[in-house]
Curated annotation (Swiss-Prot):
Keywords: Activator, ATP-binding, Cytoplasm, Kinase, Nucleotide-binding, Nucleus, Phosphoprotein, Serine/threonine-protein kinase, Transcription, Transcription regulation, Transferase. It holds the Pfam family Pkinase. The gene is HOG1. This is Mitogen-activated protein kinase HOG1. Its cofactor is Mg(2+). Proline-directed serine/threonine-protein kinase involved in a signal transduction pathway that is activated by changes in the osmolarity of the extracellular environment. Controls osmotic regulation of transcription of target genes. It is an enzyme of class 2 (transferase).
Amino acid sequence: MAEFVRAQIFGTTFEITTRYTDLQPVGMGAFGLVCSARDQLTNQAVAVKKIMKPFSTPVLAKRTYRELKLLKHLRHENVISLSDIFISPLEDIYFVTELLGTDLHRLLTSRPLEKQFIQYFLYQILRGLKYVHSAGVVHRDLKPSNILINENCDLKICDFGLARVQDPQMTGYVSTRYYRAPEIMLTWQKYDVEVDVWSAGCIFAEMLSGRPLFPGKDHVNQFSIITELLGSPPDDVIKTICSANTLQFVQSLPKRERQPLSEKFKGAEPLAVDLLERMLVFDPKKRITAAEGLAHEYLAPYHDPTDEPVAETQFDWSFNDAELPIDSWKVMMYSEILDYHNVDQDSQGIHGTPLNTEAQRVPM
């Protein structure tokens, strides 16, 4: 049985195994608190993420289960990887991942990026997206703060809590506004992996200029700002709008012509502008893919088709439409944790046993 210790971080109780020491707060989001720690087993610095109240509602339980499944499945150099997971006696979930020193948001707010860093960061973002998309996964919330970077400029995409299956009927109001693809605002229904490419394009533009490209105050203002630069959406896109109110709003906007991005980004080299033009396209089906972006001439210094892998298997989304009670998500989550630690579930009494009585048996 693992031994647990408690620490207070920002008024939040961290209850972790003695394997992890030297807790220091790193960041806090809507769904979790992240601390850096020292892994006594490997002597490596790690990030420990506490999921806040994972079993308080079925929605949060499902979200946590989804993120756990994705972290277990996705294994790529440019995607954050899971190194440990455990449930504390208080029934909190803790994900342990590699620790990277900063994120792209912090870099962008501290200093302008030089060309070679912009190229290398964009290359790694697209390399990670190519892999994620090949697994049948859409991130849905790509933004600078979800892109982690270490002192060697290695980049990893993180925070897959909102990720979803590739689905032509995908719904929801998801990504942070500045990086949200127009098809999400226009339809709230039919969108796919192309939304991540749009977000990556917005991030690319921000790296080039040092400030957000589309800083909308709300979703109406956001869409209006997009049309000021990219022009009015084409008829093929307008035809996909499902909401009568949204259609009326779009048709009420003045007709606008697309502005040359070379005028907006006068200091950028032509190849950078050309790639950006291909990423920021209204029609998602005409938007460049992550794989195509990697092959663009702008990224030629880093492009290596033999070292840009795709996923070996598709992610299993069979659970995603399930509407289950909290106790069912608990048992499923515990099963995933036992599987991660290669523990025989029958010997641990998983079947028909309340999760909280077994949580401390997860081996570290």
